[in-house]
């Protein structure tokens, strides 16, 4: 019976060690946020402010990479660390949704979540009954390329 208990403790410790190894380094993209739209400029591009956080001590020796859109290659992230936050700016073309993901080049399994954001036109609509879907017919996007900011809940949707 003591052997069974000892094996159970050993197995639990081993599983805990494996889980700790898998989550040793994690990143979270603070900005851009999901479904955010950034105004394009006259060159049909925008500077996108990237803000990444980590709760763990990380090497700040240039091992952070990003991938803009799934079918593109990973690139070195050039930016600045301040405490546990990384700040960078990327030049992104307008036209549709983009995704961004971050990882540690030394341990590629340690990644951030994938965030979808857009670069294009930002319009402020106020005072129109249909702008808040209060008209006779609720409005909906036909293309999926429309996002709205909910001021009450402070989020893009």
Place the predicted regions along the sequence by residue.
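Sec-dependent signal peptide recognition
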Residues: 1-9
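Hydrophobic h-region of N-terminal signal peptides that target proteins for export
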Residues: 9-18
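Cell-envelope and extracellular/periplasmic
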Residues: 21-157
């Amino acid at each position: 019976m003591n052997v069974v208990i000892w094996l159970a403790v050993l197995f639990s410790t081993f599983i805990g060690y494996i889980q700790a190894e898998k989550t040793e380094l994690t990143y979270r993209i603070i900005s851009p946020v999901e479904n955010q739209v950034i105004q394009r400029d006259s060159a049909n591009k925008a500077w996108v402010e990237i803000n990444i956080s980590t709760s763990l001590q990380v090497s700040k020796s240039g091992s952070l990479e990003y991938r803009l859109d799934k079918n593109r290659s990973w690139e070195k992230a050039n930016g600045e660390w301040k405490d546990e936050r990384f700040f960078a700016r990327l030049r992104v073309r307008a036209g549709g949704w983009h995704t961004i993901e971050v990882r540690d080049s030394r341990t590629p399994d340690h990644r951030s979540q994938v965030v979808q954001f857009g670069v294009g036109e930002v319009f402020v609509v106020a005072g129109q009954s249909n702008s808040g879907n209060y008209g006779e017919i609720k409005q909906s996007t036909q293309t999926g390329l429309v996002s709205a900011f909910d001021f009450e809940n402070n989020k893009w949707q």
